[in-house]
């Protein structure tokens, strides 16, 4: 796992930017590699620090806010698997019983962050009479994208099967996530849960924040240096290609200061969900860059928080 300082310094996903011979930049700098993007333009589109100069401060704030929340609202940690990293933090009101559950999947370009950086939204949900769960999983390079998907699926299946242990309602499990966690959230929302040993209707809704529905441009970008997938896996783990499995409503949110490519990714995912009558709402967070969008859930009075709680019928 790379540390936060390295991650921000090298552009949150552009760790290999000094070794891009595979993309043959020098051969034809004007060649379009995806839509109307040249290679450099596509690399920049998936390098978040190009669009968010305050990235380090915001990311550091995730950990700081999370620590403050845990001091005031200590969670209970459970294991959902056999590995030390396979655990999750449960934040619940005192005397919780049969409450709706929001599970959060952290971002970090599939390379960094953890449940310990993801406690910020807990007061919003606990204060509304719900349970908030931040899940942990292994990041790259020690893990693969298929491995992350497997861990997230097992974590959600565990939550559904064990909800009553911590006062939750197994019939009211929701999922949310930001950035690469937004992608993983969309994968969870397009999972055939019955094929994975869980109830077909395990999830009742979700919130995708600044995610990615199509991995094709991701693997063509600088991130393709570490997000290594076969053509079949690109399709398998692209939610846009698996929408026939979506069986619950979802909110989609992104910031107005995000890269045009991330706006496109989220807008097209929202449009596709709408086409299948699975879109619960769209939120363009005004004045927010990629990293700031998720902080909307830290404020109970934000439009996104209110819509999320309404999605959960609370």
Feature map (PLM): residue ranges:
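C-terminal catalytic histidine-bearing segment of alpha/beta-hydrolase fold enzymes
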Residues: 267, 276-314
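N-terminal cap/lid segment of alpha/beta-hydrolase-fold proteins
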Residues: 49-95
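N-terminal secretory signal peptides and thylakoid transit peptides that target proteins
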Residues: 1-15
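Short amphipathic alpha-helix adjacent to the substrate-entry channel of hydrolases
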Residues: 116-133
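Mobile cap/lid helix-loop segments that gate and shape the active-site cleft of serine hydrolases
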Residues: 211-242
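Alpha/beta-hydrolase active-site loop
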Residues: 144-163
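The feature captures the conserved acid-bearing segment of alpha/beta-hydrolase catalytic domains
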Residues: 205, 231-264
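Primarily recognizes the serine-hydrolase "nucleophile elbow" in alpha/beta-hydrolase
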Residues: 160-220
